Amino acid sequence: MEIRLEDRYLREEGSVFLSGVEALVRLVVEKQRRDRVEGQVNQTYISGYEGSPLGGLDLKVVEQLDLLNQLGRTVHQFGINEKTAAAAMLGTQFAASGDVDAFWYGKAHGTMWIPDEVWLANLSGTGQRGSMVLLTGEDHRSKSSVSPGASDWVLRSSLVPTFYPANVAEILRLGLHAVALSRYTGVVTALKLVTPVCDGASTVNLDEARPQIVLPQEEYSKQFNQIVMATRALPMQQELVERKLPLVQEYLRLNEINRIVDADAGGEVGIIATG
């Protein structure tokens, strides 16, 4: 059987060999193909500011723009900095079509630049079918940063549900969940991407990496708030805290995102671990 480098993005079944950064490009491919099966393909917008461990992501996206545009309209813009890219992410949700999936990428130190934009985006919500997903590169060991960095506290303070892939395959599985959750609730979601996962590579079983997404039974009609200002923001924050976040928790429960392993072992002590 002939194997080509393009198979990492083109192959639709079986297994593919991907690096962590390549898996992020494949995530967009999977999202678009999933939409095509459902009969409505969202547009995709990607912007950010490169940095370890996501260095080179922008170039790989540009390399595959022709393929991505064959599957659905895709726009990539190099961010002047992290803040302008985050502002552009929110700006995509103003599209009249309401069908833009926006991805922001940057390292942890860049995430520290954007809490204002992310908080405003969380209050505004997303377009009718749109989503906003942050791809945060975590340089815990200060591989190419002035100091070690992590995005956890910034994301938590902005009430951003954060998925934490432990391997390359989980970038696809949890990335698709991040898009689906943002589309359903209107919240900004994030993928926490650590250096060993981004710099690593592995063979990914595509069937196992594609989740069966289950939405809560409660029908939720999200609203996109074009203007967030003064007292008008108060009911938006109430909606975020009292309606959207409980729906986030229900989504996580239904889709078994936080898995319990060996629960029947009869032990008295449990260990909680992320990633």
Locations of the language-model features?
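Thiamine diphosphate
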Residues: 1-168, 194-196, 256, 260-268, ...
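Flexible, low-complexity linker and terminal segments
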Residues: 1-31, 165-275
